[in-house]
Amino acid sequence: MTHPYKTREGGATVTVFVPYDCQNNCPFCINKKEYADCSGFSLDKILDSIRVMDSITPRCDFVFTGGEPLADLNALQRMLDTIPATHKIYINTTFPAQAATTFEEMLAFTERNKDKITCMNISRHLQHYVEESPDEVLGKIACPTRINCVLYRNYPADRLVDYVERFLPYRIPIQFRYDYTETTPENLYEEDNDRILQDLKRLFTYKGLDGCRMRNGFHFEYKGLHMTYHKTLPYSTIVEKGDDGVTYDILYDILIKQNG
């Protein structure tokens, strides 16, 4: 970085890459290659880094991703227990069918931690890339939930309404996501040539837009269910002039990698 840096207001989001792999191979995942060799991964060092980040930004958000955070509930519990209540905690998961962990065990985990977890972001895509848990299981998750759906390349737009109808019985909000590896400052707020946005506007009720220079959300509603179309830039820092006239590198995200 060539300028003095500072975190965004409220502190940068701290994303923790869990030190264990998932069994998925989603085509848009850029993290999978990092799990090809798990030597050097360290839960203890990650716990140390979590404590450091808490001391620096005691109100920042923590996001757990991977990998599959729910693949090792004991390790995930240790990480959650290290984070004080001043932070919001988000977990990105496929809530998958797993050989070593039952749905009942995963649901019990959400019950034990429902006061810790701000939201569990559950991947459910139009195309099936993993063995998913039944939708009825998602309706039993004790903590707040949101469905995440990456609309990847030639997605089947004619299935969008049926997809949303699928989750109406559980009243779980849905976030459609643009492939962030293809997001640029030039297309972040592009509307006319954004096929996904135009499909969503055609099928659902558009409610408005919010965002910043780093990410945004186009909001929709369908039969009382809230949906968002989310776009974000694939990097963590932007250059911005502060109110004091100084140009800063604004840090939006801090990564804690698998080795801590």
Walk through the language-model features, giving the residues of each.
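Alpha-helix-loop-beta-strand connector modules within alpha/beta enzyme cores
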Residues: 79-90, 138-141, 214-216
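Radical SAM enzyme [4Fe-4S]-AdoMet core and its adjacent flexible, acidic
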Residues: 125-246, 258-259
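Short, flexible/disordered intra-domain loops and linkers
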Residues: 36-41, 99-105, 183-194
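Distinct, well-ordered alpha-helical segments
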Residues: 74-81, 99-112, 131-136, 157-164
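Canonical Radical SAM [4Fe-4S] cluster-binding loop centered on the CxxxCxxC motif
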Residues: 1-45
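Core AdoMet radical
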Residues: 13, 31-43, 57-72, 85-102, ...
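Acidic (Asp/Glu)-rich catalytic clusters
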Residues: 53-56, 84, 106-115, 135-142, ...
